[in-house]
Each structure stands twice: as structure tokens, then as C-alpha cells.
From Swiss-Prot:
<keyword id="KW-0460">Magnesium</keyword>
<feature type="binding site">
    <location>
        <position position="119"/>
    </location>
    <ligand>
        <name>ATP</name>
    </ligand>
</feature>
<dbReference type="Pfam" id="PF02110">
    <property type="entry name" value="HK"/>
</dbReference>
<keyword id="KW-0479">Metal-binding</keyword>
<dbReference type="GO" id="GO:0005524">
    <property type="term" value="F:ATP binding"/>
</dbReference>
<dbReference type="InterPro" id="IPR000417">
    <property type="entry name" value="Hyethyz_kinase"/>
</dbReference>
<dbReference type="GO" id="GO:0009229">
    <property type="term" value="P:thiamine diphosphate biosynthetic process"/>
</dbReference>
<keyword id="KW-0808">Transferase</keyword>
<keyword id="KW-0418">Kinase</keyword>
<dbReference type="GO" id="GO:0009228">
    <property type="term" value="P:thiamine biosynthetic process"/>
</dbReference>
<dbReference type="GO" id="GO:0004417">
    <property type="term" value="F:hydroxyethylthiazole kinase activity"/>
</dbReference>
<keyword id="KW-0067">ATP-binding</keyword>
<feature type="binding site">
    <location>
        <position position="43"/>
    </location>
    <ligand>
        <name>substrate</name>
    </ligand>
</feature>
<feature type="binding site">
    <location>
        <position position="193"/>
    </location>
    <ligand>
        <name>substrate</name>
    </ligand>
</feature>
<keyword id="KW-0784">Thiamine biosynthesis</keyword>
<dbReference type="GO" id="GO:0000287">
    <property type="term" value="F:magnesium ion binding"/>
</dbReference>
<feature type="binding site">
    <location>
        <position position="166"/>
    </location>
    <ligand>
        <name>ATP</name>
    </ligand>
</feature>
Length: 266
């Protein structure tokens, strides 16, 4: 897809500031992923600075991975400010379906905020749609390609957003169009925070294109980087470092050579 390659160049030219209200587990790896790609990360969740920070950010990423009584109001306030300012908001409902708190928090944000992209695994997206029993902790335990296609379309329509259901094949839909992305590698599941990083990378691309193409761009670039990383480092520890390297090294030429993206009209 030509637009993916062009968006990569645009991102590096503009160096967008991506505000992340994310979980403790992935702050470092997410920030490094964004820096390697060519974006600028900021991890800011203090209530007293949200208005200032959201106003200067290019996009907002909300990740519910480590919730508590302080972070939930921060996420909600930031999402409201970003909605008022018409900034792209990317929501990652980490572990939705595993506990009532996670599902409730994700649904509340989806209800009042203008979410540009909802990115999660099969179980998480199924949970926010009310289809239970497919999540264990923060990991999806069931995946069926046909179900994932329907899930992506249905979530997009239900929440009036772009829905990205990630797994062996990533499906991205706005309810009218559907993209299938076959890039990536199973080793991503052996390193914590890779899904969270992909969400923040979508946030970076949301600064340079509309939500559907931003999500496709982010997942394609991250998937190709993972493939290239595994070819050089087939073990989890060195693989993670190589993903950073390839997020830095990937260029338009490599995207055009390696992208495995198909578009379908719904």
C-alpha cells in the first residue's frame, strides 16, 4: 500500500508528539518504540498538567493496562480534553473481559469520548462488545479469522470508530471498509508490551493521516519490523532490541517490498 510508505515519511518529517497515559509495564518499551520510529513520546498522566499536555500533543493514547483510583479519572479527563480539542484518541482496552473494572472503564471512555481507533486483541474487542469468555488476563485465548473479521466490522459500527483487531492476521475496519494485514511474527507474543507499542505507533500515524489509514500504517510498519527483527534475532530478548532497530531502519522501499495488506469493501 503506497499510503503506508508515504505516511512513514510524513511521520518522520513531522516528528509528532504522542501523549501516552499507559501502564507501568510498558512505558519504557513504548517510548523506545516511538523514538526509534521517529515520533516523540511523552508519558503524562498527572491531572494538573493534562490540559496543557493534551493541547500540545499531536495525539492521545489511552491504555488501561494498570488501572487504579488515580489513573482512571486521569484517563477520562484527558480523553474529554482531547475530544473537545478534536485530537486523535487511540484506546487500548487491555484486559477487557478479564475483570469488570477493565471492561467498565473501557466502555465508559468509548461512550463519551470521540475515539479515533480502538485497538485490541480478539478477546478484548469481543469483551467491549459484550461477547464474553475469550480473555484471560491481558492475553486473548481464542482467535478465529472469520470471527475476527466480523468483530472488527461490528465494533467499528457499534462505537463509531476504527476498530483494529490484532492477532495472526490484523483486521482494521471503519464499518464500511476492511483491511487485512498479514505482517508480523508469533515471537511478538513472547515479549511483553508489543501490542501496547503497536497502539502507540498507531497514535503516531494518527498525526499524519485519517484513522483508518493510520491504523493500517501503524500495524503494517510494526509487523514488517517484527519480521525483519526475527530474521536476525530469533529469541525474545534480542528480538525485542532488534524490533527497535528495524523501527529505526524501515523505510519506504522496505514497506513497499514487504507489506502484506489487502483491502475489502464491506
Amino acid at each position: 500500500m503506497d499510503f503506508v510508505a508515504k505516511n512513514l515519511t510524513k511521520l518522520r518529517e513531522t516528528n509528532p508528539l504522542v501523549q501516552n497515559i499507559t501502564n507501568y509495564v510498558v512505558m519504557n518499551s513504548t517510548a523506545n518504540s516511538l523514538l526509534a520510529l521517529g515520533a516523540s513520546p511523552v508519558m503524562a498522566h498527572a491531572m494538573d498538567e493534562l490540559e496543557e499536555m493534551v493541547s500540545i500533543a499531536s495525539s492521545l493514547v489511552v491504555n488501561i493496562g494498570t488501572l487504579d483510583e488515580y489513573w482512571i479519572p486521569s484517563m477520562e479527563k484527558a480523553a474529554k480534553i482531547a475530544t473537545d480539542l478534536k485530537k486523535p484518541i487511540i484506546l487500548d482496552p487491555v484486559g477487557a473481559g478479564a475483570t469488570k473494572l477493565r471492561t467498565k472503564t473501557a466502555l465508559k471512555i468509548l461512550d463519551f469520548a470521540d475515539i479515533s481507533v480502538l485497538r485490541g486483541n480478539f478477546g478484548e474487542i469481543a469483551a467491549v462488545l459484550g461477547e464474553h469468555g475469550k480473555t484471560r488476563g491481558v492475553d486473548s485465548v481464542a482467535y478465529d479469522s472469520n470471527e475476527a473479521i466480523e468483530l472488527s466490522k461490528n465494533a467499528a459500527k457499534e462505537f463509531n470508530t476504527v476498530s483494529a483487531v490484532t492477532g495472526p492476521i490484523d483486521y482494521v475496519s471503519n464499518g464500511k471498509e476492511l483491511y487485512a494485514i498479514s505482517n508480523g511474527h508469533p515471537m511478538l507474543s513472547k515479549v511483553t508490551g508489543t501490542g501496547c507499542a503497536s497502539t502507540s505507533i498507531i497514535g503516531a500515524f494518527s498525526a499524519v493521516d485519517e484513522p483508518l489509514k493510520a491504523a493500517v500504517s501503524g500495524l503494517t510498519v510494526y509487523g514488517i519490523s517484527a519480521e525483519m527483527a526475527f530474521a536476525e534475532a530469533p529469541y525474545p530478548g534480542t528480538f525485542q532490541a532488534k524490533v527497535y532497530d528495524w523501527l529505526y531502519r524501515i523505510d519506504e522501499k522496505l514497506v513497499l517490498e514487504k507489506a502484506k495488506v489487502n483491502k475489502f469493501e464491506i
